[in-house]
């Protein structure tokens, strides 16, 4: 039986501001990426998100981003590799403290937003992220963009496991990177299109780029953005489609 991980960005509410459908989505995913307070989230939200994830037996990962609450961590920042290392180490450590107090074990790290996209094409940024993971806990998995040489090389250098990620609700360019959110066609909002893209990636090993070109992709985990307009509908539909097609949903080991 084919196995795939279905992950979702979670814990992105902040104080009185609620974001995402965390509680509703949890039953349909196998792992979550918890915001650590830099781009979103706060200590109370972090704790509550972890506790709920453990109730659903969902794997917990840190979702470190740039210190940019106003921009939600989706704006590039001119930072050094050393600064990225510090940002990531700090955020992993913060979330890990909450996970341990709750009696759980952290599973992975997935960079957020602009940090993720920069790391996918910038070896120095990817190296800083992998180094932070290695220094705090080398058994943590690294979720990174499928086929990214920067992520692959960083994971090999520090002997950490890379889980190659693809996206259900984002479009792709012909070089295998994600279409920028500044472009009108960056997001997939149609449920049928999202399902078609996911099945192509999981079953056939490719994704159709915005120009129609087929791009090879070996997806080990599929991401849904928890703040997406139709995140809950997509999660339910993907979950049921996988069940129907005999595809097991399970967090990677």
Swiss-Prot record:
Superkingdom in the source lineage: Bacteria
Uppermost EC category: hydrolase
An annotated Gene Ontology molecular function: ATP binding
Catalytic activity reported: 5-oxo-L-proline + ATP + 2 H2O = L-glutamate + ADP + phosphate + H(+)
Single GO BP term: carbohydrate metabolic process
Keywords: ATP-binding, Hydrolase, Nucleotide-binding
EC number: 3.5.2.9
Keyword Translocase: no
InterPro entries: Glyco_hydro/deAcase_b/a-brl, LamB/YcsF/PxpA-like
Key word Transmembrane present: no
Chain's role: Catalyzes the cleavage of 5-oxoproline to form L-glutamate coupled to the hydrolysis of ATP to ADP and inorganic phosphate.
Family to which this protein belongs: Belongs to the LamB/PxpA family.
Assembly mode: Forms a complex composed of PxpA, PxpB and PxpC.
NCBIfam families: PRK05406.1-2, PRK05406.1-3, PRK05406.1-5
Record protein name field: 5-oxoprolinase subunit A
Organism: Bacillus cereus (strain B4264)
């Amino acid at each position: 039986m084919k196995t795939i991980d279905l992950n979702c960005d979670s814990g992105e509410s902040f104080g009185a501001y609620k974001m995402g459908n965390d509680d509703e989505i949890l039953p349909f995913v196998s792992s979550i990426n918890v915001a650590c307070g830099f781009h979103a989230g706060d200590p109370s939200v972090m704790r509550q998100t972890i506790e709920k994830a453990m109730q659903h037996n969902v794997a917990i990962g840190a979702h470190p981003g740039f210190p940019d609450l106003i921009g939600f961590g989706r704006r590039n920042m001119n930072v050094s590799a050393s600064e990225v290392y510090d940002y990531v180490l700090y955020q992993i450590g913060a979330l890990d403290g909450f996970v341990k107090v709750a009696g759980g074990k952290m599973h992975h790290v997935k960079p957020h937003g602009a940090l993720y996209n920069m790391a996918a094409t910038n070896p120095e940024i990817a190296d800083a992220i992998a180094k932070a993971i290695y220094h705090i806990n080398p058994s943590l998995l690294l979720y990174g963009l499928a086929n990214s040489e920067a992520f692959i090389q960083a994971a090999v250098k520090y002997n950490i496991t890379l889980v190659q990620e693809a996206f259900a609700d984002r479009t792709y360019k012909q070089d295998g990177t994600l279409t920028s959110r500044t472009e009108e066609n960056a997001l997939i909002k149609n449920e049928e299109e999202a399902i078609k893209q996911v099945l192509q990636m999981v079953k056939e090993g490719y994704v159709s780029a915005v120009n129609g070109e087929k791009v090879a992709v070996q997806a080990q985990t599929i991401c849904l953005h928890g703040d997406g307009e139709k995140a809950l509908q997509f999660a339910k539909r993907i979950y049921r489609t996988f069940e129907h097609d005999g595809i097991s949903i399970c967090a990677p080991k």
